[in-house]
């Protein structure tokens, strides 16, 4: 699978990149929302993992850009915000699942 990881925290980004790569996936990464939007609107990805709180534009805006581009690529939203309303907001914005950090 080809996976896009959009995560501003270098340690988390590298952890995900390494783990997914070792599992045999091709991984591209971005460290901010604007770069994430540029990459995420490309239909080549099978799955996207997007942090909710990113510099330049937040992860929910990245997810919205993906959906506005007409892409149905599955999106996993990562966030330290774990309240029920945070999860509901993420899913309503177009995320397919929501994972609370730390994991």
Predicted features, each with a name:
Residues 1-103:
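N-terminal/domain-start alpha-helical segments
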